[in-house]
Regions:
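Single conserved hydrophobic/aromatic residue that forms the stacking wall/gate
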Residues: 1-6, 10-11
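Long, well-ordered early-domain segments
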Residues: 15-44
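Short, structured active-site-proximal loop/turn typified by the sulfatase FGly-forming signature C/S-X-P-X-R
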Residues: 7-8, 26, 30-36, 180, ...
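Active-site-proximal cap/lid insertion segments
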Residues: 44, 70-197
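Acidic, His- and aromatic-enriched active-site or binding-groove loops in soluble protein domains
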Residues: 37, 53-73
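Substrate-binding cleft/loops of secretory-pathway carbohydrate-active enzymes
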Residues: 48-54, 160-163
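The substrate-binding groove and active-site-proximal loops of carbohydrate-active enzymes
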Residues: 12-19, 53-61, 111-127
Length: 199
């Protein structure tokens, strides 16, 4: 969902399709000769604005299509933008012994929610990290590392969708850009996702 920052005098949720004449990152990259690929979930519209060169849907309505991604990265021979949209860490939450109450440092108020959901929520985050790690291994394996920028971001933080509190505003944002950003660099710069395209 695209929010046109500054075009409204009040803050509201814009849960509508993007206007057809809006230039999206996908349309701009395609005009510049890139293939634009979506792998995973999709609930953006209309297709005229988000016009994918290829779309690889989720596997079993849940998992990233790693085999399709691997095949694409092995054979692609032109500039590309691969957008990976994971379902994680959304539920369902698996039962797991890998995480317990001691691992949860921001406890919700409902202790039953902590015991029944948060360990599975944390496990989903770990599973998401594992899947994305496999994609990075593919990027490296097929020789794309030095010519690729990898951006990882989320639409909100810890269970904070539609919130202007910390959990809605503080989100993960990780960039791997060989030759431009030194590994293990951290920044306190304030940014939003709308800063990515002009940057």
């Amino acid at each position: 969902v695209l929010r046109l920052v500054g075009s409204e005098m009040c803050i509201r949720d814009s849960h509508i399709g993007v206007k057809p004449n809006i230039k999206s990152i996908t349309s701009l990259l395609k005009e510049s000769g890139y293939e634009v690929v979506l792998a995973g979930k999709s609930h953006v519209k209309p297709n005229k604005v988000f016009d994918w060169t290829h779309y690889f849907p989720k596997v079993n309505n849940r998992y990233l299509p790693l085999e399709k991604i691997d095949d694409y990265l092995k054979n692609v021979n032109k500039p590309f933008c691969l957008i990976i949209a994971s379902d994680y860490p959304h539920g369902p939450f698996p039962k797991t012994d890998n995480y317990g109450k001691a691992d949860i440092f921001k406890l919700p108020y409902d202790p039953n929610y902590v015991g029944n959901h948060k360990p599975g929520y944390y496990q989903n985050i770990q599973d998401d990290n594992d899947q994305l790690g496999k994609v990075l291994e593919m990027v490296d394996k097929y020789g794309h590392k030095e010519s690729s920028m990898f951006i990882y971001a989320s639409d909100h933080g810890l269970s904070g969708k539609w919130s202007l509190q910390e959990q809605g505003l503080r989100l993960p944002f990780v960039v791997r850009w060989p030759g431009k950003i030194m590994p293990n660099t951290t920044s306190e710069t304030l940014l939003t996702l709308v800063d990515v395209l002009p940057t």
